[in-house]
């Protein structure tokens, strides 16, 4: 019989849908298992095979756990708010909702074709009003707890896009979307007080089964450090500086303020106002990432003012420097160029003094003055001495600081969740009540922003201006929207109870499913999404509305999928199919030599592979199999369509083996042993997520199994059941072909018996006077007499003419003839 995936795959996909095979149930008699993908943004480009690595891995685990008898939740949804759909709307006038729905339909078609076992009854998009009603409600929980507030913030603002951007949405001073210039501006924004949970976010990492690299990234992002705050007096107020090295205080030769520091205007002398204003303007065109990058030179400008050193009382020049950020510490740095590389670069750039106050061993030197004797001290002892001095003289105090800053939550966009707040003229505001949610955005024709810092919602006067019946006052709706992160902060909780119209989730369902047992997604989300989701979850835990302190028990980052790209230097990428190899070099149709690389699959590099093309040619099961075979789940891997073809050839052989007339009711030990060993290897591989080893295990199995004269039917059935998580369509077809009822998953995961793993034979080492002379494969239950006779025969040429004084016999291991 011939294997034809085109005939069987759609048939079994319809069977799964009609039978609701993957519908999750809260069954208290079963152990639950919640396996989740980081859900995708439904872009117009659709999926390429790079996206499928993680999706295939979670699907294998979900199918395996169902077969083991777990109650499995394996859902899929859409992170559907975001800037790309809005930019497309600006260019074309097409409503973002229409674009999003079209893209989702395409994504669903692609995922269905791969045979993924999602519980489609729980599907939703973050742009569904039924969903973002609860996003708005959860935001209001943060607001009511004082964790959401408005403040004037230095932000990355893109005039062309008309919105604030996160650092991750900027590259080399330009927006990732569209490549438009970005500048720094002070704007009134909504902010979430994530810093209030800094310690909980740090401590919670210790309990998580996550990659150490991800945990370290989050620790670095939070950036907890202990030190001291030091007060430097000026004519216009006190400059508070945070330092982790109070023991170097005597070595301060300048202060550097962030350009956004509130004292800059007051401290700038009349003579310096013009150059300071110009410097601040230039700084506004730089992102924070650019400002703190490791440059060989540092930029800055003198304010014309001085501060008094708290110990020596010397006058210290006050500079403005863009490498100082307003959000960390106090937005001011004490420059100790002798003992800080950045400070030294700055001092050398502007010819400032360099005063050494530590010797090579880290012992304080040159650090004594009246009432202050630091010389000879080092390390924590020296730091504590300075802190005690500062506290006793009311010049500072011990302090813990964090790099983590409160989360800028506003976006000046249309396609995002409206923030459910009404503002009044006196500066007060009112959160909307539950019955007023969801707050829907108005239908508009022009999606462009309304002036600096105002999103397109601000244009719709009849929507913005309201009479609030609760307070009997005229008010204005908030015109900022939430960032795309908002919907992804809690979607995993909504999957527990996706269509609850009375609450974001029912308590008993959250208690049943949470936490997520396995979460797989890209390493690019290591900090922001994962940190923001943990923050919201810990707020909910403190509020008593979730039962676990952490949302994601185990995290795995899949590696990147690389593919060959072809680029004309200085011009751009070309499609691989038009590149030609001539005389050992790759050239474009124009004859220009190409730069050939292995790079991450992407639309921009023209090296993405449409999975549907591969499915049409080789079948979904072959694509799934190669997606795992291509390399370890967490490592980068190079994609090869030839590899998919190889997996298709294996499936052809497997189909032929199962459909062979050699399959019979038989208890052939060797055949059963091969099947049991296969199942054990597949089980171990799935448990350890070493999924790349599974295809080779099957290939080794079939190479040995087809040598048998008879294929024991029970062994064949075991192999089919073991293949089902990886290649589900062919497994379903073959399961029925073997005479079973449809639904291979219902048959359970095959049990492995130890006696078949050990085999019927053992290898005996035969020695003469301790030297290896032969090996024997003999039956395990062979008697001592049989073993000795066979051993003597195998070593006969070494025993000829010799007297055997003793035969040492170690059962199942060796025979040693002493002659």
Swiss-Prot record:
Q: Name one GO cellular component term.
A: cytosol
Report the InterPro entries cross-referenced here. Answer: aa-tRNA-synth_I_CS, Leu-tRNA-ligase, Leu_tRNA-synth_edit, M/V/L/I-tRNA-synth_anticd-bd, Methionyl/Leucyl_tRNA_Synth, Rossmann-like_a/b/a_fold, tRNAsynth_Ia_anticodon-bd, Val/Leu/Ile-tRNA-synth_edit
Q: Which GO terms describe its molecular function?
A: aminoacyl-tRNA deacylase activity; ATP binding; leucine-tRNA ligase activity
> Where along this sequence does the record place binding of ATP?
603
Residue ranges for motif 'KMSKS' region? 600-604
Q: Which UniProt keywords apply?
A: Aminoacyl-tRNA synthetase, ATP-binding, Cytoplasm, Ligase, Nucleotide-binding, Protein biosynthesis
Where does it reside?
A: Cytoplasm
Record carries keyword Ligase: yes
According to UniProt, the reaction catalysed is:
tRNA(Leu) + L-leucine + ATP = L-leucyl-tRNA(Leu) + AMP + diphosphate
Kindly state the positions of the motif 'HIGH' region in this protein: 40-51
EC no. given is: 6.1.1.4
Keyword Phosphoprotein applies: no
GO BP: any one term: leucyl-tRNA aminoacylation
Q: Name one Pfam family in it.
A: Anticodon_1
User: Matching HAMAP family, A to Z?
Assistant: Leu_tRNA_synth_B
Q: Which PANTHER family match?
A: LEUCINE--TRNA LIGASE, MITOCHONDRIAL, LEUCYL-TRNA SYNTHETASE
Q: Which family does it belong to?
A: Belongs to the class-I aminoacyl-tRNA synthetase family.
- Name the UniProt record assigns to this protein: Leucine--tRNA ligase
